[in-house]
A protein has these predicted regions:
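Acidic, low-complexity Ser/Thr/Gly/Pro-rich repeat segments typical of extracellular/periplasmic
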Residues: 1-185, 189-193
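C-terminal subdomain of alpha/beta-hydrolase-fold enzymes, centered on the catalytic histidine
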Residues: 302-305, 361-555
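Primarily recognizes the serine-hydrolase "nucleophile elbow" in alpha/beta-hydrolase
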Residues: 316, 324-377
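Loop/turn elements at helix/coil->beta-strand transitions in domains of secreted/extracellular proteins
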Residues: 235-239, 266-269, 335-337, 358-362, ...
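Cap/lid segment of the alpha/beta-hydrolase catalytic domain
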Residues: 192-218, 231-329
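Short, solvent-exposed loop/turn and secondary-structure capping segments
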Residues: 7-13, 36-39, 65-69, 76-87, ...
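A conserved hydrophobic secondary-structure block that centers on an alpha-helix together
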Residues: 44-71, 75-76, 214-259
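Domain-level recognition of soluble alpha/beta enzyme cores
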Residues: 159-233
């Protein structure tokens, strides 16, 4: 396939994917709505024939059916791509004595009718297919059951926790660091440790079965009281949850200087726990799952448990006899709505947490995105893990397809499956006015800005403009599909922070360049000031003076 001769829509010009003659099209088969997209060949395929990857530029709606159509595609020799005989059979309306072929005719005709109604001429099609997105129940039913069971359990049990460590002045901006564990029922098998799946009543659960309560286990936590609370004992601290990065730990709250700085600058008491499923405890199971993809349900299930663990920690922070009532915290004052702040994986998982939590309505997502299936092939973090995967799956084509298929499970355990339920269509038991502030590092080597833009469009977020300085974007319209935010606006917002890193490559490959800006936005004091205004006043503040937002390079 020749991508240029085929005029494949590129992420640099998403508007072109909506043109009447676009070579690759996605439509909602019920409404006829065109979906913005880009299409590209896998850039690191080696000697194998490259895959054509079609990437919607906005989240598809739960339970909706869509059709993908391709036309005017050219080979590298300049010839038209020849449709398969099977596709021609249906497109051209043939019949057969083979009932296996005729069995699909009704469904194919419905798809062709939908495409024709959307202005896609049937005779021009080289390939088309339709599919239905997983339902909201399929994506969220399990975690909502786990959440509700867990909160019911907390409501009927006196909080049980153990303080295992008290470190006064652990850092110069920390008054006291308190670590420990709290009791919580798991919905996983056994003791809920890495590698466990959801527990069900049946040993052979059906698609509609829901997880059940299992053992009561110890969940780790750490909290840090900022120094401002002892410098001025009248200070009332805001309660906040923090979410750590890739395969990390709750102790990022301590070694992450940005978290301590935000706590000190904005009067926040942050607590954290592990993202069970993708924490330091899960590295071994992640390796096993990459070597044997049939093990991946253990990752997706435990991620959902990890989200609920975070919800439970937040509830125990705001309970009169909960964790913060312990003498280890001294005579501090904590009040206000629970907020969330997380970076990298914490930004990705934070989208899911925000959607599912009954207590969080404001979240700051640092270097965030959704959809690991899109992220991994564009992340330097995946280089090492792909090398682990390669012996079992030596074909890059197979690995790329497998990652895309895994996303159907991953959607239940990361932001991708919940993105349609943060700013609209709220999930049962959650608040109605949720909003997030997304801080994106321009040219990020680890979390692609392309996936962040997809998330922002899906949220209906506004974007700060100018997005970047002239000449610093490959897009025809930087921030395409997003309305501009103005100072004082409420609602969800995405802000690009540019520290001068190289722009991301056009193809499906990780960025290069000497500097990875991944940590730059969070280390910028003005960026943190914007975070605080959003979290605690509910408004967007222009801290960049109407100019592109720039950050100093970390380190």
């Amino acid at each position: 396939l020749d991508p240029k001769a085929s005029a494949l829509p590129e992420w640099t010009d998403l508007e072109s994917s909506l043109s009447s003659d676009a070579s690759v099209v996605i439509i909602d088969t019920e409404t006829g709505e065109r979906i913005p997209l880009w299409a590209e060949l896998d850039a690191e395929i080696g000697d194998e024939q490259p895959l054509l990857i079609v990437q919607p530029a906005v989240a598809l709606l739960d339970g909706h059916s869509y059709a993908v159509a391709m036309r005017n595609l050219k080979t590298t020799s300049g010839a038209d791509v020849v449709p398969s005989p099977i596709f021609e059979f249906y497109r051209d309306g043939y019949t057969s004595d083979n009932e296996r072929l005729n069995r699909r005719t009704t469904e194919m005709e419905a798809m062709f009718t939908a495409l024709t109604s959307a202005g896609i001429e049937r005779s021009t099609l080289q390939l088309a297919w339709d599919f239905t997105v997983a339902s909201t129940q399929n994506l969220t039913g399990r975690i909502l059951e786990v959440r509700d069971n867990t909160l019911d359990w907390l409501d009927t049990h006196t909080p049980e926790y153990a303080i295992t460590s008290i470190v006064p002045a652990s850092k110069e901006d920390v008054a006291v660091q308190v670590a420990g564990t709290f009791k919580l029922p798991t919905h996983l098998t056994g003791n809920g440790s890495a590698g466990q799946k959801f527990a069900y009543d049946s040993t052979t659960p059906g698609p509609n079965d829901l997880p059940i309560l299992g053992e009561v286990v110890d969940v780790p936590f750490i909290c840090q009281v900022p120094k401002v609370a002892v410098e001025d004992p009248s200070t009332v601290l805001h309660p906040g949850l923090y979410g750590h990065g890739l395969l990390g730990s709750e102790y990022e709250i301590d070694y992450g200087g940005d978290v301590r700085a935000l706590a000190q600058e904005a009067d926040v008491l942050f607590c954290a726990t592990k993202w069970a499923g993708m924490s330091e405890d899960d590295v071994g199971n992640a390796v096993v799952s990459l070597q044997d993809l049939s093990n991946f349900p253990t990752v997706a299930d435990r991620l959902q448990q990890g989200i609920v663990n975070m919800i439970a920690l937040g509830r125990l922070m705001n309970t009169d006899d909960g964790i913060l009532s312990d003498p280890a915290f001294g005579d501090i004052k904590v009040a206000g709505d629970l907020v969330y702040y997380g970076n990298s994986q914490g930004g990705i998982m934070g989208s899911a947490l925000t959607a599912v939590s009954p207590d969080i309505s404001r979240a700051v997502l640092g270097v965030p995105a959704t959809n690991y299936g899109l992220l991994l092939l564009r992340s330097i973090d995946f280089d090492q893990y792909e090398s682990i995967m390669e012996p079992a799956y030596p074909s890059r084509r197979d690995r790329t397809i497998a990652i895309s298929l895994l996303q159907m499970l991953w959607d239940r355990g990361e932001g991708g499956g919940y993105i349609n339920h943060i700013t609209r269509d709220p999930l049962p038991g959650t608040q109605l006015d949720k909003a997030v502030l997304m801080h994106v590092a321009w040219g990020d080597h680890q979390v692609s800005e392309l996936a962040a833009f997809n998330e922002a469009r899906s949220l209906g977020a506004k974007i700060y403009r100018p997005v970047v300085a002239d000449g610093r974007s490959r897009e025809t319209t930087p921030g395409w599909g997003l309305d501009s935010v103005t100072d004082g606006d409420t609602g969800s917002v995405i802000v690009i922070w540019d520290s001068g890193a190289d722009m991301i490559p056009l193809g499906v490959t990780p960025p290069g360049g000497e500097h990875d800006p991944h940590e730059d936005p969070r280390d910028d004091k003005m960026a943190r000031s914007q975070m605080a205004e959003f979290l605690f006043d509910g408004v967007f503040t222009d801290v960049c003076g109407g100019k592109p937002c720039t950050a100093q390079r970390s380190g």
